[in-house]
Amino acid sequence: MIKNYIENAHFEDTGFAYTLSLISGKHKMVILYCLMEFETVRFNELKRYLKTISDKTLSTNLKELEADKLIVRTEYPQIPPKVEYTLSERGKTLMTVLDQLCVWGEENRLTE
């Protein structure tokens, strides 16, 4: 029965594939964890936390996370411009899943 299901499955339409599409990429999970830990973070603070990320890559990741409604971007009308990022309520619900992934990774990491 399971073999038949797998043979006929469209994994791109599953919740699993959808969730992976939201968090795929080198930096998205780290960005989400920074926002969970520090709650409200500005662009340059994220850049400092991530160290090796370029402005373009960080900007792209933030736009994608915002489009997926995992984070909230708040822009303040002042000079110089001030923009802050926080986890959305939807993003907060994802963090429990990511925590479990991290726990599994720590418990099952292969050592040489």
Where are the predicted features?
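Short, Lys/Arg-enriched N-terminal segment that forms or immediately precedes the first helix
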Residues: 2-20
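N-terminal helix-turn-helix DNA-binding core of bacterial DNA-binding proteins
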Residues: 14-57, 84
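Generic recognition of well-ordered alpha-helical segments
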Residues: 18, 48, 60, 96-99, ...
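Generic detection of well-ordered alpha-helical segments
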Residues: 25, 29, 63, 92, ...
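Canonical helix-turn-helix DNA-binding module
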Residues: 47-73, 80
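Basic, amphipathic "hinge/linker" alpha-helix immediately C-terminal to the N-terminal HTH DNA-binding motif
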Residues: 77-100
